[in-house]
């Protein structure tokens, strides 16, 4: 096989498709080469974005896109949201099994013990422009943590030193995100508590007061829903970096940078911008029809893995409705507009398998109920996803082979340097 081929092997064909760019291959012709493998037959073809291409074996999470099921280590997210906590879910993702009560208590204590950010990193955050995006700040801070843990590496992923570094990442994520919500607005950070839960502590560090337990429970559920989602772009980025045997801080920093993109974690910010642009439910149909006519994105709609509604979106929508009804609140204009957008998109796009994804309702939850500004949405997403990234880092380096895909070369043929 040519080293310049980005390909997928498909069972059931006796033909291999090879793109030749050597000078002797005039007009860059496709060559059909027939071959026989003793065990099976394969065909290779270029797959843009590696869509649907198996890149690894993993036991961390799974998706049934037809039925709309997401499970962590075999447990459905519905069950985890109803019965678990973010701390327990993080430990499940990391270790593969639900912890015992004592193991969970020990883990919570360790998270709280390690939730303070190093003084020099605190100074680093203060030195950055307050206008900086939270994801750029978070990526910088996570990468800098490696300088304090030089021996946390892939060569001994199960050592107590490396395991403590992994826990430090999860623990510091919430502190770093909360610090920037305040520093970016000119306020002093609030030191983390040593007794609160992960979700409770985050709200306290952001707002300086203990939050309503109902709000804390909603945040905890949201963190569970965002903790893991198989091989998405940011997780794959983390894995690719880990496959070079990079330290966990460099690998998770790569994931943070990838999550910042508008086609990934940043999408929930764009959903809120979209809803504000639509303005009210009565404007939704024309706005959507115009977008479809011009082949433009409708933010928060559609997911490559799901042929039905994203189960996380279903849970988030239900959570918001339950909270509003229980507290006798009026539907916000944004939420009413979102419901109308979903209704119209179901009418126009459901036959194409396009339904709301997790980003469609998460921004509303963050802004309308938690009172976070949209600039911090994606960093809160990263805070939750750190549990999944850490689990994938460990899984990757424990049975590693460096990722080295191939490509299809479409540049100039071999040529001589011009004579002087």
Q: Predicted segment positions?
A:
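Generic detector of N-terminal low-structure segments
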Residues: 7, 11, 29, 36-38
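Charged/polar low-complexity intrinsically disordered segments
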Residues: 16-17, 26, 39
């Amino acid at each position: 096989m040519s080293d310049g081929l980005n390909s997928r092997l498909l069972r059931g064909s006796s033909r291999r498709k090879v793109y030749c760019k050597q000078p002797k291959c005039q007009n860059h012709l496709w060559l059909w080469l027939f071959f026989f493998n003793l065990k099976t037959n394969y065909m290779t073809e270029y797959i843009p974005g590696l869509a649907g291409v198996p890149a690894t074996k993993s036991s961390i999470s799974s998706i049934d896109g037809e039925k709309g099921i997401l499970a962590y280590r075999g447990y459905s997210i519905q069950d985890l949201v109803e019965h678990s906590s973010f701390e327990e879910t993080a430990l499940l993702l990391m270790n593969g099994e639900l912890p015992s009560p004592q193991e969970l208590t020990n883990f919570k204590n360790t998270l709280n013990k390690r939730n303070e950010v190093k003084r020099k990193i605190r100074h680093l955050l203060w030195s950055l422009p307050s206008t900086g995006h939270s994801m750029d700040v978070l990526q910088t801070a996570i990468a800098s943590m490696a300088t304090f843990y030089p021996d946390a590496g892939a060569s001994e992923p199960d050592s107590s030193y490396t395991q403590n570094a992994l826990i430090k990442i999860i623990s510091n994520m919430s502190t770093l995100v909360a610090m920037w919500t305040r520093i970016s607005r000119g306020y002093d950070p609030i030191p983390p508590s040593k007794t609160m839960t992960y979700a409770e502590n985050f709200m306290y560090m952001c707002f300086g007061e203990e939050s309503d337990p109902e709000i804390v429970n909603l945040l905890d559920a949201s963190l569970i829903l965002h903790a893991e989602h198989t091989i998405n772009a940011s997780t794959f980025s983390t894995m690719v970096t880990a496959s070079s045997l990079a330290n966990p801080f460099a690998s998770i920093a790569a994931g943070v940078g990838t999550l910042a993109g508008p086609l990934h974690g940043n999408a929930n910010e764009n959903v809120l911008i979209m809803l504000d642009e639509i303005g009210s439910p009565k404007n939704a149909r024309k706005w959507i029809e115009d977008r479809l006519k011009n082949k433009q994105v409708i933010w928060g709609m559609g997911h490559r893995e799901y042929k039905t509604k994203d189960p996380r979106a279903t849970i988030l929508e239900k959570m918001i409705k339950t909270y509003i009804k229980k507290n006798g609140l009026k539907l916000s204009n944004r939420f009413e507009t979102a419901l109308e957008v979903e209704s119209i998109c179901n009418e126009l796009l459901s036959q194409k398998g396009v339904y709301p994804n997790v980003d469609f309702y998460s921004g509303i939850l963050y802004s309308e109920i938690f009172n976070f500004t949209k600039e911090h949405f994606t960093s809160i997403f990263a805070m939750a996803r750190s549990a999944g990234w850490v689990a994938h880092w460990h899984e990757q380096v424990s049975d590693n082979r460096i990722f080295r895909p191939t490509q299809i070369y479409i540049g100039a043929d071999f040529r001589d340097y011009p004579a002087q």
